[in-house]
Amino acid sequence: MKKLIWKKKQYDDLTIWMAEVKSVGWQFSIEKIKEKKYEAFVYYGHGEDHPIFPQGVYLTCLAEAQRVCNDWLHNTIIGLNKWI
């Protein structure tokens, strides 16, 4: 398993941890978001817009942190995790 180097970003009171991952010609940034009890992973891809984050984003939360995940996002995360 590849060891990720996490970089910290701060957006107001929101702390974000980001790590770069490269695979199959694609580059993804993975941001681990922690805000109080809320925790999530944000997956950035190419050519997608998001109103909050400056790059394209696939966003989901960890089910144990907040139960708002849906199947599509969950499957996306499983697919990207295979590249790490």
Predicted regions located by residue number:
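Short N-terminal "domain-start" leader segments
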Residues: M1-H46
